[in-house]
Amino acid sequence: MTAATLVTLALSLSLAQHDAAPAPAPAAVEQHGAAPEAAASADPHAAPAGEHGAAVEAHAAAAGEHGEAAGHEGGHDESLGAVMLHHVTDGYVIEHPGFCNGAFAWNCEWDLRATFGDALKFGKLDLTPTKHVIMMWLASALLLVVVLAAVRKKSLVPRGLYNFIELLVAFVRNEIAVKNIGEKDADRFTPYLVTAFFFILFLNLFGLLPFSATATANLSVTVAMALFTFFITQYAAIRAMGMGGYVAHLTGGVPKSLAPLWLIMVPVEFLGLFTKPFALTVRLFANMLAGHFVILALLGLIFALGTPWVAFGSVPMALSIFLLELFVAFVQAYIFTMLSSLFIGAGLVHHGDDHGHAEEHGHAGPGMGSEHGSHVAGASPGHG
């Protein structure tokens, strides 16, 4: 029961009591000897009752308007919060401009569930794509188009957009992969790093376009991408060190003579394996989500305060944050790619470290300490 209904009932009861109070009025008329008037006393009192009924309706209408106004004002902040959440959360409806209901509108809706129906439902497993999945499909398609067009270019000297794309590819290879992984192994992991860089970049840029969505503000998307880096990192480490060396690395380099410390080092090293993908996940997700919330909050000041004059301050501020988000789109793609290359390179570097530890601690016989020490010292630059 709404507040407007309660107010209407209260007014009706009070007015009903007020109607019952002036009952002696006909007797007063009869005492004055106005018989003809007494005969017609029902009609004059019917008119006040009608007036009271009109008053009740007026009060009810006023109460209803008051309730609606209060509900509108109370739900204004909720509607602003709902708009903000709707902008960043995933769903099955994509808004777009177009012709719907026989006329052009800016808020036409594409219901993905209605489009795909039950074609992608397998029991309790629902594979119907959401709007973030659609954005990832578009980013993948754009990535294929750009790469294939750049590969098939006829001119040896790239121009325009292809020059910019080639510049970014060379930057990822030379400044990220080579410096963090090494010249020897960089080319093996450059394709993944380039793909991750452009995929994240396109998703970030799509989120700045009207009627689109920011898939990188979805925790599930960033978790999946961080897991790709995690599995590639573990694969690189196992391939470089072997399974035995990989497991031995979990001891943190503590020698067998201090084996009791393994009870501390092994859990710490094991947890350290998962802190890296966690950092990748939260960093990308939080940065992209926060930027959109700030823009929407600044624009929402116009509606929250109820005056258009706020637009002179909030719109320029929102535009400034938008330009900053354009820069952040490139920065977050770079940071994710750089951290991924650092983690991969760390797994490869551990191979040289463990090899040095094995030579120092595992195979030196009695009387060979000084000779072996000089051998390791002389070989260490080669390992670097």
From Swiss-Prot:
Q: Where in the cell is it found?
A: Cell inner membrane
Keyword annotations: ATP synthesis, Cell inner membrane, Cell membrane, CF(0), Hydrogen ion transport, Ion transport, Membrane, Transmembrane, Transmembrane helix, Transport
Region of interest: Disordered: 23-76, 355-384
Q: Which GO terms describe its molecular function?
A: proton-transporting ATP synthase activity, rotational mechanism
Recorded hits in Gene3D superfamilies, A to Z, give:
ATP synthase, F0 complex, subunit A (1.20.120.220)
Q: What is its main location?
A: membrane
Under Pfam families, the record lists: ATP-synt_A (PF00119)
What family is reported?
A: Belongs to the ATPase A chain family.
User: Sorted alphabetically, which NCBIfam families does this protein's record hold?
Assistant: ATP_synt_6_or_A, PRK13419.1
* PANTHER family hit by this protein: ATP SYNTHASE SUBUNIT A (PTHR11410:SF0)
What this protein is reported to do is described as: Key component of the proton channel; it plays a direct role in the translocation of protons across the membrane.
Its quaternary organisation is: F-type ATPases have 2 components, CF(1) - the catalytic core - and CF(0) - the membrane proton channel. CF(1) has five subunits: alpha(3), beta(3), gamma(1), delta(1), epsilon(1). CF(0) has three main subunits: a(1), b(2) and c(9-12). The alpha and beta chains form an alternating ring which encloses part of the gamma chain. CF(1) is attached to CF(0) by a central stalk formed by the gamma and epsilon chains, while a peripheral stalk is formed by the delta and b chains.
Q: What is this protein called?
A: ATP synthase subunit a
**What organism does this protein naturally occur in?**
Anaeromyxobacter sp. (strain K)
